[in-house]
């Protein structure tokens, strides 16, 4: 009887120990599950952060592409402005050459007109001198008449030349007037071109400042991309570490669950053994 009691006490003690171990296993399993859930939550959080970083990186790359496109457009605008400036300078040069040729033609026509006027004046003075003398000598008169005829002929020729010169002068004056109009137009155009050049110069300065700012923004974007890439790699490393931790915790949970099942089976075996012992005692 004492042996049975001792056996029962031992079995009870073993049962209590099994219960304690089962409770401990259950608590450890719950703790492991909590740690696994926490690790999974951290992994999900890291995954969200990685997604956010990837989105930020995509946005930054898109902004960088837009900045590069704007910079290309500004380069094209700068090239167009330089071409316009070159064309305007060429037009100014052509206008100046045209004005210079017109001034030369005007100077030549003025000199010819002065020569014709001087010849006409000399002929007229000679005629008046011959008339005032009143020479009686017929031969002298004939000579004078011949001289007068020559003078008249010269005067007529001079008149013709004068008319021709006057006609040419009128043409030259018309050309001069048109040249002056073109010169005035050219001057006003030069003023407009100078204003356009000033505006183009300001635009060039603005483009240079914009290009410098764009370069600074590009450097900032590159630095930001570098920082985001580093953060992405760090987040991926943390995610991999968290995933390994989750796998490790899951293995620990599986081990504790297996141990719990084993303890429960052991506890059931002890209970069955106690029941059998009680049945034998009652039967005796």
Curated annotation (Swiss-Prot):
Coiled-coil ranges (or none): 1-284
InterPro entries in the cross-refs: Tropomyosin
The organism's place on the tree of life at top rank: Eukaryota
Keyword Cell inner membrane among UniProt keywords: no
Keywords: Coiled coil, Repeat
Protein function: Tropomyosin, in association with the troponin complex, plays a central role in the calcium dependent regulation of muscle contraction.
Domain remarks: The molecule is in a coiled coil structure that is formed by 2 polypeptide chains. The sequence exhibits a prominent seven-residues periodicity.
Quaternary data: Homodimer.
Family: Belongs to the tropomyosin family.
Protein name: Tropomyosin
